[in-house]
Structure formats: C-alpha cells, structure tokens
Amino acid sequence: ITPYVSESPLSVMGRELPQYIQEKGREIRTFMPKWGNINERRNQLHEVIRLSGMNLIIDDTDHPLIIKVASIQSARMQVYFIDNDDYFLHRQMVADEEGNEYADNDERAIFYARGVLETVKKLRWCPEIIHCHGWMSAFAGMYIKKAYNDEPSFRDSKVVYSTYGDDFQHPIEPGLGARAMLKGLEQKDLDVLNGI
C-alpha cells in the first residue's frame, strides 16, 4: 500500500480502493505485511500491544504475531501491519535484492493470512466484504470459508480475491498442503496445493 512501499498497480489499488469505500460511508480495515523495507520511524508505525502477543504455529514451529499500526493522514485511514521477525524483518516482498525468491514465501503467506484473521477476531469486527489482494492473501479465502466459517466475525462475510501478475519464477516447495493445514480443513481442501 502506498506510501509504505513503492508505487505499483497493487500498492496503488491497496491505497485508493479502501479510501474510496470509506468515503462512501463504509467501515474499513486495511492490512498489509510489515515488509523489511518499510521504515517504521518515517511512517510512524507503532505496536498495538492489545492485539499482539499471540503465537501462530506453522509447520510445528511457533511464530509470534506482532501487530503494528500507522495512519495515512490525508485519507484518515489506519493501516494494520502484520509482522514477525522470522518472516518479514530485513526482507523484501517476494525476493531479495539480487532477485532470489525466498524459499519460505508459502509460509509467509500462511502466516499473513492467519495473522489478519486472528487480528480481525481480536478487533471483534464483522466485515461484510473481505477483499484479498495478491499472492500474500491467497490463503485467507480458504481459511475464512473452511477453518473460520463458524467464527462470528466471518460467518456472513463475502470474499473477493484479486490477482496481480505473476511475481513468482520458481515453484512452491513441496508439502505446502501440510503447512497450510488448520482445524476445520480437510485434506481434500489442500490436495490442490501440493501440485503447485
């Protein structure tokens, strides 16, 4: 989302669409990963202690969920940042400065999707529409409809997913289905992931 990352079709859409919806009188929440190239000091990010502190387990490893927030003053919008030192600290979006894709991009996407959903639960917010943008949010729709389907925050939510280009050049590591497993999902829900 601009101004936190450089301008691209996805970052501009992530900035302008929520503002437009908010200006039409709707309540919005905007989330994005706290990429390593986002300057916390310049953008005035600060941790939200009441939302942070949970651990998410991915592939039998605990990963602390840290929630930060900043405001886009000109739009009167808050942006929530999903953060974790293992997945986002000192790391760019898809690949490092030399163009090498991160081997754990799948786990980063799982962590981000689950982090957003757990934060929405803690906020006790019931969104009518959840608009997922790009590869990082790809797991959110499946989790909402299968693993979080009885959760009051998501029971009546509709999910829209927008894709943007093909950022990946290398296939996802084998075993993605096992890493994405959550209570409420069945193996058949994840079998398609193992062939990616």
Spans of model-derived segments:
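Catalytic cores of nucleotide-sugar-dependent glycosyltransferases that transfer UDP/GDP/TDP-activated
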Residues: I1-I196
